[in-house]
Amino acid sequence: MKIGVFTDSFRPYTSGVVRSIELFSREFNAKGHEVYVFGPDYPLLHPPKEEGVFRFVSVPWPTMPDFSLPVPISSQLGSTIKRIGLDIIHTHSPFLLGRLGARAARRYKLPLIFTFHTLYDQYVHYFPFVENTSKNVVQSIARNFCNRCNIVVAPSQLVVNYLQRIGVETSIINIPTGVDLEEFNNLETDWLEKNYDVSPDEKVLLFVGRLGKEKNVTFLLKCFQAVQARYPLCRLVLVGKGPQENYLRKLCREMGIEDKVTFTGVLPRQNIVHCYASADLFVFPSVTETQGLVIGEAKAAGLPVVAIRAFGPAETVMHGEDGFLTDLSPSSFVTAILDLLENKELYDRMSKQAYKNVAHISSSYCAEKMLDVYRELIDRKDFAPRKKKYKHKNVIGNDLHNFLA
């Protein structure tokens, strides 16, 4: 099977979307299939040429230097698709290259599948061309794109419910991004001690993710301040970078916890895995995750998780078994963390259960589920994606739809 992946982000940019594409692609290749990625170039990061990766001219985004916006124009796209002989197109964005992929699927009569990775209306603050547009319009763009596809993949059942609630009529199937369990063998459990200012006596609270507004890291710092006041021998390690990093560092200084918070920046994949192995507890305050892949990774390393009860984490964390889900309340979040730090029996039980509970979402198993969907679509032969005409009372919405359609 020859699979065309159209995405608005790809390595060397780091995100859950990129990680998902990498994991599925690797598993597809291992099972004898071919994956071709159509994604952005990153002129400031100089990505190496890779076989099977076709990059579009891109413009660095002013507020996020590591992110680039692809220009969805290519005189060679049609000939490339015909030369490869794609069997299916899988898009990972309802914008730009995702739209280009949808047009290509319609033109070449290929089945079109879309993974809804992101609650797009929660991220409009990053994009000036839609930031003044209502969240309802951004939601509408995503809904109408879903309705152009043959099948929509949602990484959690709560996202399936959300898509149905906003009016998606296309068939929706729940397939999470799996966890590569083999990554978590033979790890360095003292890697943080060797490479950062982490004492062997400290309990390490770990966060992995983008340091952006949508990840709610400010909330986490306030909670950690309260935890540290009661349990001084603990440290918070933040793995990742993002537009809020300088603000968060300043906040740590103002709160008097800068000596207890470690910022690692972006790390190579293997070092991220070592961070999981070196930590004691995974803390995740985001309320905008469709899945929260990092939670599954933390559980694969045997870390109990404390997260906010919202969308993806609400399904990924088994409350009371391998971690705690709390309301968006500092006191509840702090109490859950302290319960695990101060109760060794509870911690040990949840740590063992964490690994057991993640085994059912291995990357190999999830990839096979996705391949079954591909096969079903290809065999149906009635998959021609349809073009939607967008009609909105909102003038800005009309303009955006006409531009992006």
Language-model-derived ranges and their functions:
Residues 81, 146, 266-267, 274-279:
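Short alpha-helical donor nucleotide-sugar binding micro-motif in glycosyltransferases
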Residues 1-57, 368, 375, 386, ...:
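N-terminal subdomain of nucleotide-sugar transferases
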Residues 287:
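Aromatic "clamp/platform" in nucleotide-sugar-dependent glycosyltransferases that forms part
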Residues 319-320, 324-330, 339-345:
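Conserved acidic donor-binding segment of nucleotide-sugar-dependent glycosyltransferases
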